[in-house]
Amino acid sequence: MQEILNKAYKGFMGVVDSFANSTAGEPSKPKKIEVVKPASIPDYAYSCDNYIDSVLENKLTRQTLRAIATKYYGQQIEEVTQNGSKLTEKNYPRLFANFQDCCKTLNVTNHPKVFVTSRLTGINALSVEIEKEPIVLLSYMSVIGLNDLEQKFLLGHELGHIQLGHMLAHTVQGLLNDLNKRVELLGPIVTDLIDVPLNRWYRTSEFTADRAGYQCCKDMNTIRCLFKRLEHDAPVNAFNQYKELSDAYPRMSTRLEQLSKYVLIIKLK
């Protein structure tokens, strides 16, 4: 185990430098970083949800992050996709229709694969990227226990992560949190890396994804009810924990507050 962690340490030390360099500058006058962005940034994107662009723009950093993500989560994701049920119109017609509708609403033309799996407990969904391929994972309870609008919010949320390119950084953020807990030596380094820039961006990325979910759902009452259910359905298995139980993951009340502000702005336009 120690040998593996040592390799991980060497692998992301360069990433530390990239994060540090991308956030350098005086607080009052932050340094402007030129970033090559996608041809079209969705209108729902949170105004601060551009931090990770400057990091992933570095080819070496991007390759390192992908290598780390694949090494430590690739096998888990492969097992999930092999043992789960791939979404088709035949096996989950209602979910399939809702997914197609969300893709149309968000203008997602390259549809990611969706798998329904028992590895996620309760009402849960997760978007990941392995070998440059985005995948959406859904729990069985999300299929049978949610109505159409609730499913659309959940699917739209994950599609928002994919559309903005969040998955790779989310995966590595989970790994770094895990390393921080396991290796005392890495504590100060990982804490500086995670708590200051990455966790701040991580929370912002959730606000953006919630906006995407709203675009697909268009019903705040549905979202409020769903958030109440999610608060009482915390994930318990190890596969879930790297994302949902992270200190960076914003509280439901905070997410709802931010989303309500966004909806109010839309209605006032």
Model-inferred region functions:
Residues M1-V128, D195-V196, A234-N237, K243, ...:
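Hydrophobic or amphipathic, alpha-helical segments that drive membrane association/targeting
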Residues K90, V136-F153, R200:
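Short pre-active-site segment immediately N-terminal to the catalytic Zn-binding motif
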Residues K90-F96, C102, L106-T109, L186-K243:
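Short helix/loop segments within enzyme catalytic domains
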Residues L155-L164, T208, A212:
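Active-site His/Glu-centered metal-binding helix of metallohydrolases
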Residues E158-D178:
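Catalytic Zn2+-binding segment of zinc metalloproteases
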Residues V172-L193:
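A structural motif
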Residues A248, M252-R255:
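Amphipathic alpha-helical oligomerization/assembly segments
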